Each structure stands twice: as structure tokens, then as C-alpha cells.
Amino acid sequence: MTKASVAIVGSGNISTDLLYKLQRSEWLEPRWMIGIDPESEGLARARTMGLETSAEGVGWLLNQPEKPDLVFEATSAHVHRDSAPRYEAAGIRAVDLTPAAVGPAVVPPANLREHLGAPNVNMITCGGQATIPIVYAVSRVVDVPYAEIVASVASVSAGPGTRANIDEFTKTTSRGIETIGGAQRGKAIIILNPADPPMIMRDTIFCAIPEDADRAAITDSIHRVVADIQQYVPGYRLLNEPQFDDPSVVSGGQATVTTFVEVEGAGDFLPPYAGNLDIMTAAATKVGEEIAQKLLSVEA
């Protein structure tokens, strides 16, 4: 079966976990991993898996006689902003796992098919991938004037990049709650949980809804979205049934539905408690596979 060729730019933990997922894909063939540290564990693992590797950066990749069909980049926002126009000029589709947001933001259950033709798509944030689908599930049934999410992740799973970009995380996720989730106004909060042993990712999604909303339809919509996510993140699950509350002073006089989810990672390279990182690499793989299917069908 023909597969789309893939390069991974970045050789850190997320890139390495992504590599394991891509190796299992029926549609994607990882061929290259590019970094800047010749001693990185990611490059070493990639070499043992038969990939061509380089520590000379994106310039090396673009100078190769054969170019990948897709590139997955997990570096930093400023690096991807510099590289994105070079990928597009070379005819390489890009899946961006940084906060750069050069291309449209994508959440697979909500809006992936709208952007399969985009030269560059952005994976938003881990909190966004875990919670925006739930807001979307509610908003496709009723109007959602306000949605708020709280993402709690193991402190040890949050690297220096995450810690340095907490404000960017909240702003990007809040924007996604509105533009993709469908809420009129969105808010995001992230909590770094210092518990030891580490806790897996847990998220609370609060949506304001009309008082006369069809609660059964909302619950059904949430369950269908959860099933969609479980196709690529098996460890994604509801902690209990969605909880509905009548209007009260606490909720600003609005009825609400609150959903609790947890995300356990697959344990490919990252530990299972790092579901916040796992959902990013799993969602990116899903996006890449859908893009590859479209590319290969056009070529056929």
C-alpha cells in the first residue's frame, strides 16, 4: 500500500512519541527526523528505526533531492514561523504542533475536513484537543453563550516550553473554544498538578445552555464526540455522565452542563500519565492520516 512520506522536525519527547505513532500508521511513512542536537535521544531512536536523521536543521531537509509529502513540526513557535513559508514553497504540507498558529487551528472531531486542503494546520494546545470537542458537541445542539475549561496536567509532564507559555496556552485555547467549539465566549485555565505519583490529565468543561435545552440530545452528542476521539486516543474517557444544573446565582442565572474527562496516554514513549502530550501526538497523527488519504486519492 502506498503511503505518504513524512519528516519529523524536532527531536524532543513529543517528536519521539509522535514517531512511534507514525510507525503504526497505515497511511504515513516516517522517513526523516531533523533536529539540532546530534546527541539527542530522539535522533538516536529514529536512526535505530531506520529513519534518515540530521542535526543540521530544516535547511538540510529542504536541500535533499527527495522531499517529504508532509512534515510534522514540534520545535517552537518562532522556529515554525520561519520554516512554514519554506515548506509551502517546496510543496510540503505541514502539521504544526507548536503555538505558531500559521495555519488554521484543527480539532479532528470538529473541523478537520474543512481544512484538509490547507498547506499548514495547527494543533492548538493539549487542553484544546481534550476539551474543545466537548464544547463543540454541546454547541451543535444548543447555543452556548459561555464555556470554560480547566485542564489539570501532571507537573512533571510540563516542560520549560509549556511553563514559559502558560498565557499563550490560555489565550489560544480560549480562542479555540469560541472559533471551533462554537461558544460565544470562552475561557481556559491550566493547572500544573504537583502530585507524586503523577496524576493523568483531567479536564472539566463547563457550558452555559438554555434553560429548556434538550438534555438527552446534549448527552448523546457528547457521547458521540467521545467515541470519535477514542478512535485515535483510546485513553480518552468520560469520568461520569454529563451533569446538568438549573439556573442559579452561582452560574450567573444560566442553566449549565458540566463534563469531566480524563486522558491516559498510550505509553509509546511518554509515560501514560502524560495524556496531555499524548493527545497532541495522537491528534496530529489523525490529522496527518486524513491529509495523506486525500493526497494519495488525488494522485491515484
Swiss-Prot record:
GO biological process, any: catabolic process
Signal sequence region: none
Binding site for NAD(+): S11, G12, N13, I14, S157, A158, G159, P160, G161, T162, R163, A164, N165, N276
Catalytic residues as annotated in Swiss-Prot or TrEMBL: C126 (acyl-thioester intermediate)
Enzyme category, top tier: oxidoreductase
Catalytic activity: acetaldehyde + NAD(+) + CoA = acetyl-CoA + NADH + H(+)
Intrachain disulfide bonds: none
Keywords assigned: Aromatic hydrocarbons catabolism, NAD, Oxidoreductase
GO MF annotation list: acetaldehyde dehydrogenase (acetylating) activity; NAD binding
Family listed: Belongs to the acetaldehyde dehydrogenase family.
Protein name as annotated: Acetaldehyde dehydrogenase 3
Gene source species: Rhodococcus opacus (strain B4)
